[in-house]
């Protein structure tokens, strides 16, 4: 029996075949198991010798099973590794290259320019209260910007900020002049969506406050931004305009030599000298917090512009809605230009 069992074990080519041999000989109803079960029928004087003989056979079969199982498992592992082998000399799969979204790239360009001029870059809450968004910025209750049709109002009386200017108020309340900041973030307007308008868009806004700050300082700052964004040949044009939180106010445009042709004036944003009423509102808020009134008598300028407009003009994007379509076929076109 021992020789027959070992022969069948060595002939097994798979683990399933080996298991069948194991069941045949040492399973619950196997040949060796039955021999052990029949020992009780033997006379006592034969039982011990026969039991030792059967145990020797059992041990030999178990040893052969263990050895053959190891051989078959190693063979199976080798076969699997061979089938899954990777030729490391083959070229790898190309990884899709990412790139900055056009708006993010314009943001990075703008904030980089102002950081080099010593500005701190800050952000603020997108949900604002009416006072910080309007009243403190010299926008009284009867101003058209307070119309319910132009603003996203929340049930608790708060609103989605319509510009990044409220952060100027918050920053001045918490900090003393002199100061130089740019505020970046999303703003919201309740208006119809078309190729040039979205209900949500981005702004970058700057504020400088100190002693003796003049319109000449503002013009120099805008000119430096234009040169940093469009090159050393960029020229800046200012035209009078009205904004309730600055006086005097102006719109500014940049002459851009477009490498695609069609060089033209690009209207980028608005600016002006901070209105005295804004400083007065800041001091009122500071006084309510037990802080000294320090802004009345100071001078400063503010400016604001939209990254979407800059990106649309610079990269020839015809529809603002493309920025938010999340279509990689659209955004991927600008990967090379945007770095």
Swiss-Prot record:
One of its GO terms (biological process) is phenylalanyl-tRNA aminoacylation. It catalyses: tRNA(Phe) + L-phenylalanine + ATP = L-phenylalanyl-tRNA(Phe) + AMP + diphosphate + H(+). SUPFAM superfamilies: Class II aaRS and biotin synthetases (SSF55681), tRNA-binding arm (SSF46589). Pfam families: Phe_tRNA-synt_N, tRNA-synt_2d. This is Phenylalanine--tRNA ligase alpha subunit. The keyword Iron-sulfur does not apply. It is found in: Cytoplasm. Belongs to the class-II aminoacyl-tRNA synthetase family. Phe-tRNA synthetase alpha subunit type 1 subfamily. The keyword Magnesium applies. It is an enzyme of class 6 (ligase). It comes from Deinococcus deserti (strain DSM 17065 / CIP 109153 / LMG 22923 / VCD115). Its EC number is 6.1.1.20. Mg(2+) binds at residue 247. Keywords: Aminoacyl-tRNA synthetase, ATP-binding, Cytoplasm, Ligase, Magnesium, Metal-binding, Nucleotide-binding, Protein biosynthesis. Its cofactor is Mg(2+). It comes from the Bacteria.
